[in-house]
UniProtKB/Swiss-Prot annotation:
It is a multi-pass membrane protein. Belongs to the ATPase C chain family. F(1)F(0) ATP synthase produces ATP from ADP in the presence of a proton or sodium gradient. F-type ATPases consist of two structural domains, F(1) containing the extramembraneous catalytic core and F(0) containing the membrane proton channel, linked together by a central stalk and a peripheral stalk. During catalysis, ATP synthesis in the catalytic domain of F(1) is coupled via a rotary mechanism of the central stalk subunits to proton translocation. Key component of the F(0) channel; it plays a direct role in translocation across the membrane. A homomeric c-ring of between 10-14 subunits forms the central stalk rotor element with the F(1) delta and epsilon subunits. The chain crosses the membrane at residues 10-30, 53-73. The lineage of its organism: Bacteria, Pseudomonadati, Pseudomonadota, Gammaproteobacteria, Vibrionales. It is found in: Cell inner membrane. One of its GO terms (cellular component) is proton-transporting two-sector ATPase complex, proton-transporting domain. This is ATP synthase subunit c. The gene is atpE.
Length: 85
């Protein structure tokens, strides 16, 4: 049982770390491409900015789902119930 709990803690740490890393890389690419597009066509910068914020919101939703899964493994681990039964 301790092995399952320790591996669950490691899995939660990996999930949270990869969520943070993926979001950081995604925002870096998104911001870089926005700046490239705004520098190339300055008259389209407001429209690109609106689209960038929409994509940024969607980009934030993915790690939130990962954090929910990590919290599930932390507080309501489904694998512990299988060991007890």
């Amino acid at each position: 049982m301790e092995t399952v709990l320790s591996f669950s803690a490691i899995a939660v740490a990996i999930i949270v770390g990869l969520c943070a890393l993926g979001t950081a890389v995604g925002f870096a690419v998104l911001g870089g491409k926005f700046l490239e597009g705004a520098a190339r066509q300055p008259e389209m910068a407001p429209m690109l900015q609106v689209k960038m914020f929409i994509i940024a919101g969607l980009l934030d939703a993915v790690p939130m789902i990962g954090i929910v899964i990590a919290l599930l493994f932390t507080f309501a681990n489904p694998f512990v119930g299988q060991l007890a039964g």
